[in-house]
Amino acid sequence: MLTIALSKGRILDDTLPLLAAAGIVPSENPDKSRKLIIPTSLPDVRLLIVRATDVPTYVEHGAADLGVAGKDVLMEYGGQGLYEPLDLRIANCKLMTAGAIGAPEPKGRLRVATKFVNVAKRYYAEQGRQVDVIKLYGSMELAPLVGLADKIIDVVDTGNTLRANGLEPQELIATISSRLVVNKASMKMQHGRIQSLIDTLRDAVEARHRH
């Protein structure tokens, strides 16, 4: 049995056509189903529906053989028990710092609000900048407006939400897309099966970008 961990939303919607190219079609619509384990058109393949931030955990610990996760999630997770063999080139966005429009660069110790705590600490450590990182789970844009933080680090798509709240994107930390991740033990035990799936998905990604 091959188990693939996916999260609902944009990543799922963009991944399903790629899986379909490999003959893997869910038996019911994951967006509408309440089931968290969904069989597919192949009797030996099933999908797990989990939170986006949990995909690498399920894969690293072997509860899933493969998964699809955003590079932002993988950077924050930082696990060593994963292969990352393929950039699926879907769910593209940018991981950026942002601050109030026109605000001067704060002097001294910086306060940064984000859900990407590990990414923030690494990023500013590389710059030799002292920071206090404040963990938030959502509505990052609010933090600079109410004096909780000087800047935020968040995923930016169009930047419209930032601008609507008086913020502007500033420094690019990473260009983000979704990646296929594979459990290291699964890759050894089911190498032929998984490598065949990787090759098929790679062909589907390339075909999609030729058009």
Swiss-Prot record:
Q: Which GO terms describe its biological process?
A: L-histidine biosynthetic process
GO cellular component, alphabetical, reads:
cytoplasm
Kindly state which keywords UniProt assigns to this record, in alphabetical order. Amino-acid biosynthesis, ATP-binding, Cytoplasm, Glycosyltransferase, Histidine biosynthesis, Nucleotide-binding, Transferase
Q: What GO MF annotations does this protein's record show?
A: ATP binding; ATP phosphoribosyltransferase activity
On whether Cytoplasm is a keyword of this UniProt record, the answer is yes
This enzyme's EC code(s): 2.4.2.17
Q: Where in the cell is it found?
A: Cytoplasm
Name the catalysed reactions. Answer: 1-(5-phospho-beta-D-ribosyl)-ATP + diphosphate = 5-phospho-alpha-D-ribose 1-diphosphate + ATP
Q: Which InterPro entries match?
A: ATP_PRibTrfase_cat (IPR013820), ATP_PRibTrfase_CS (IPR018198), ATP_PRibTrfase_HisG (IPR001348), ATP_PRibTrfase_HisG_short (IPR024893)
Determine the domain of life of the protein's source. Answer: Bacteria
> Could you tell me which pathway this protein works in?
Amino-acid biosynthesis; L-histidine biosynthesis; L-histidine from 5-phospho-alpha-D-ribose 1-diphosphate: step 1/9
Q: Which family does it belong to?
A: Belongs to the ATP phosphoribosyltransferase family. Short subfamily.
Q: How does it assemble?
A: Heteromultimer composed of HisG and HisZ subunits.
The record describes the protein's role as:
Catalyzes the condensation of ATP and 5-phosphoribose 1-diphosphate to form N'-(5'-phosphoribosyl)-ATP (PR-ATP). Has a crucial role in the pathway because the rate of histidine biosynthesis seems to be controlled primarily by regulation of HisG enzymatic activity.
What name does UniProt use for this protein?
ATP phosphoribosyltransferase
Organism annotation: Pseudomonas aeruginosa (strain UCBPP-PA14)
